């Protein structure tokens, strides 16, 4: 049995039952417990997000981030290869219906990430020198006192370091290298080394440099991809109704619209949709709370609103555009997968520039994700080993980025799925245990903080 076959068997267990039950269960729990906060709080989140866009130099504290910088760092991590290569892989393997399950995962995930951000704010740590840090390890320990809390937090910390810092960033590098090799013929290892060197420069600047880079890159890369995608979609506007038909019908009857995904089944559509949805928007995975924890806000719920917008932008905007480009152009029946499928879809209108367009987007999307994931992993390195281990960690991450460019794409994606799925378990256990505190904090915002704020107190 090959390593890939072994990883696939583990993934079948995790994504076939454990992951779906955990993500859907937690999403439903917070959706109902918080009264559909993803709908009620959407306007607040939207206003805070785009208000922050024009005042992103807001107070970040001595060693923290502004609310916008925290969101930019979170989106930098969320909007990565999962939105281009991951969405394409989900469609190629699970059929168009996989996109529907990504929608469901994202809708429920908006309430989950709200809870994650609120708890990250609630349990964040501020050092004597003003340095702010936070993340699931702190609210896991807050949820469970004694040895169990310490052990569960340590397990999560180890998982996220491997899942994102090492394996996840290898995936990002792999997709950059593959797309640039296709578009420009550049050797994969050359791109891997280039990305690793630039990444190291950003890493050595700490939180402040990471925040400055992400708040600059994220709005530009998102706008560039949105415009480029809309042009292709509107060029195939007559195919849009059929595309949504295939997504909806394919969610429940994959064989009816399988096309290129001849082996598509309902189980496969759900598995690929939820797994790729998790890898893309990261709700419930426990990654983005590291960014939301260090934001300077007046109440934890305020950052919860902002966090929800990250999932919305990632899945309902960016990922949807990729899906519609692939489906409306008829590219899903080509037998291609990953970044190559997305490149082919864009090339149906742009020609050779389509490959170049995806290569450029992939570089910025994946590079920004590498930065975000490094930051998340670093927080856990500090938690486990202290600041002295950060330098070694940054070097190992860069080695993974360089070597990840050469790995077999299927194995890299499958291993990333495996580690991402395992991260959900300790995070989910803590969120369920803290659900009462999430509700209490939510109620405090609406019953006390907001009325007092309106009175000018």
Regions found by a protein language model. Give the residues of each.
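N-terminal alpha-helical transmembrane segments of multi-pass membrane transport
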Residues: 1-81, 92-98, 109, 402, ...
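Helix-loop-helix module between adjacent transmembrane segments
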Residues: 30-31, 105-130, 137, 141-174, ...
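Alpha-helical membrane segments and immediately flanking helix-loop junctions
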Residues: 57-93, 119-122, 128-137, 141-143, ...
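Transmembrane helix-loop junctions in multi-pass membrane proteins
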Residues: 2-3, 33-38, 82-87, 164-176, ...
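Flexible loop linkers connecting adjacent transmembrane helices
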Residues: 36-65, 89-96, 111-147, 332-349, ...
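Extracellular/periplasmic helix-exit of transmembrane alpha-helices
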Residues: 115-123, 128, 228-246, 254, ...
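Membrane-interface loop-to-helix entry segments
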Residues: 22-29, 34-46, 156, 173-180, ...
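Selective recognition of specific alpha-helical transmembrane segments in multi-pass small-molecule
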Residues: 108-116, 193-207, 218-238, 271, ...
């Amino acid at each position: 049995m090959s390593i890939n076959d072994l990883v696939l068997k583990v993934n079948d267990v995790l994504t076939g039952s454990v992951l779906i039950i955990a993500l859907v269960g937690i999403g439903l729990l917070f959706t109902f417990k918080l009264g559909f906060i993803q709908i009620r709080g959407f306007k607040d989140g939207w206003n805070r997000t785009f208000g922050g866009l024009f005042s992103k130099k807001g107070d970040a504290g001595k060693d923290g981030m502004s609310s916008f910088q925290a969101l930019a760092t979170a989106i930098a991590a969320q909007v990565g290869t999962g939105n281009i290569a991951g969405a394409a892989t989900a469609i190629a393997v699970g059929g168009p219906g996989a996109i529907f399950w990504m929608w469901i995962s994202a809708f429920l995930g908006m309430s989950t990430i709200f809870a994650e951000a609120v708890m990250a704010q609630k349990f964040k740590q501020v050092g004597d020198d003003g340095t702010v840090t936070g993340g699931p390890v702190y609210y896991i320990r807050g949820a469970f006192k004694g040895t169990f809390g310490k052990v569960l937090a340590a397990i999560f910390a180890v998982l996220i370091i491997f899942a994102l810092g090492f394996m996840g960033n290898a995936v990002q590098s792999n997709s950059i290298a593959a797309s640039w090799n296709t578009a420009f013929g550049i050797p994969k290892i050359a791109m891997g080394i280039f990305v690793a060197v630039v990444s190291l420069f950003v890493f050595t600047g700490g939180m402040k440099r990471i925040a400055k880079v992400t708040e600059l890159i994220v709005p530009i890369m998102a706008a560039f991809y949105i415009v480029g995608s809309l042009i292709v979609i509107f060029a195939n506007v007559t195919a849009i109704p059929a595309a949504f038909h295939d997504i909806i019908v394919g969610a429940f009857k994959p064989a009816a619209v399988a096309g290129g995904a001849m082996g598509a089944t309902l189980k496969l559509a759900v598995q690929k949709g939820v797994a790729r949805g998790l890898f893309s928007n990261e709700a419930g995975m426990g990654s983005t709370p590291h960014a939301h924890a260090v934001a300077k806000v007046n109440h934890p719920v305020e950052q919860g609103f902002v966090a929800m917008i990250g999932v919305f932008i990632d899945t309902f905007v960016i990922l949807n555009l990729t899906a519609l480009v692939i489906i409306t152009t008829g590219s899903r029946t080509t037998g291609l997968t990953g970044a190559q499928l997305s490149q082919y879809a864009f090339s149906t209108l742009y020609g050779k520039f389509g490959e170049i367009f995806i290569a450029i987007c992939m570089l910025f999307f994946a590079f920004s994700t590498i930065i975000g994931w490094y930051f998340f992993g670093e927080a856990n390195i500090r938690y486990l080993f202290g600041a002295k281990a950060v330098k070694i960690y940054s070097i190992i991450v860069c080695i993974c980025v360089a070597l990840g460019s050469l790995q077999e794409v299927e194995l890299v994606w499958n291993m990333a799925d495996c580690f991402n799925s395992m991260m959900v378990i300790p995070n989910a256990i803590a969120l369920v245990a803290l659900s009462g505190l999430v509700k209490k904090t939510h109620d405090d915002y609406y019953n006390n903080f907001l009325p007092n704020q309106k009175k000018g107190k």
